[in-house]
């Protein structure tokens, strides 16, 4: 009886291991394809995400912005920063998340402006 139970457990772990390996390979392939599709800006953006510890999508969700417009980002940042101020009963943790999100979006806008400048220069010459 114990022998069969051990065999069932080993086979179950093998199945889970294979599924995990397959899922991991698919995730790596999807990540690589997405980075290649976005080109150089995608590589820079991924590097910034890994350095800042926050993804672009997460930063957009925190500040509740869909498009990267400086006015909307600044408006939402100021509102969320004031609302989460510790002196008015807010959370320092949430306030720091808001700051990190704004920093990440600012970095992304810098990357986009750098990639747009060479395109503008090539069209003018």
Swiss-Prot record:
Gene3D superfamilies with a match to the protein in the record: DnaJ domain (1.10.287.110)
Q: Which GO terms describe its cellular component?
A: TIM23 mitochondrial import inner membrane translocase complex
Region entry J-like, spans: 58-110
Membrane association type: Peripheral membrane protein
> Can you tell me which family this protein belongs to?
Belongs to the TIM16/PAM16 family.
How does the entry describe the domains?
A: The J-like region, although related to the J domain does not have co-chaperone activity.
- List the protein's name: Mitochondrial import inner membrane translocase subunit tim16
- Underlying gene: pam16
